[in-house]
């Protein structure tokens, strides 16, 4: 049976109000009383209900994180850094995996609002502006324009695409292509595409749906390699770049002599397990730090700029 606040009060020999004051650290209390209450809480295994505290107008110290795909290696690493940063500041994270599903994203948003979380960091993009503007909690967006009043933190996606294209050009590529997702031009992938096109205006861009299975994705990439015979490819994420290297090897296409490949994200996973891949690195740790910093300023009712853009870098491997 779950222990209640009144059970703690009875065991400690104090009033429920005193127990509440100990939990919330309010008013003067003797060390003896605090020790008695804490000992009773430990004996009974009592845990304060943060959501109930939020309903009383007190901070629940909870932050909602809404992401489209937490199994994606970039998002999983970013979420890990966000949780670490939030914990440093006394906040716990509620992780919501929207799976690019508008209904699921809306349900999560409503759940976080109902539980009066202190703030929300979101990278999902399925809902309309009205859905996010209705939320009273401070919101910070990662890489997405959620609403006019919501600050956006991102890395320089346009420059990342341009950097990749310039590197392929430097290494003599005559028939480069880009393989990307099906996002619009204002999305992170879309901005990388614009950066790539600023160097290779005539280069073909091939769009693969994020909903494709690995087998179907592999088939699509294989057809592209066989039909286009590119000498350089920029891919909008590292995992697709790694898959492309695998397919190229199966087709006996040597990397980097016949085909140069550049990925995007530069996670620690890729750096440690696929160091062969040359990729554009996003400053994931800095992104997490800035997202939390801006959110805490919004929670504290401070004015913040609308856009924050962090520089990207090059993680050199041997695929170029």
Swiss-Prot record:
The keyword Transcription applies. SMART domains: HTH_LACI (SM00354). It comes from the Bacteria. The gene is scrR. Residues 5-24 bind DNA. Pfam families: LacI, Peripla_BP_3. Gene3D superfamilies: 3.40.50.2300, lambda repressor-like DNA-binding domains (1.10.260.40). InterPro entries: HTH_LacI, LacI/GalR-like_sensor, Lambda_DNA-bd_dom_sf, Peripla_BP_I. Negative regulator of scrB expression. This is Sucrose operon repressor. The lineage of its organism: Bacteria, Bacillati, Bacillota, Bacilli, Lactobacillales. Residues 1-57 form the HTH lacI-type domain. It comes from Streptococcus mutans serotype c (strain ATCC 700610 / UA159). One of its GO terms (molecular function) is DNA-binding transcription factor activity. Keywords: DNA-binding, Repressor, Transcription, Transcription regulation.
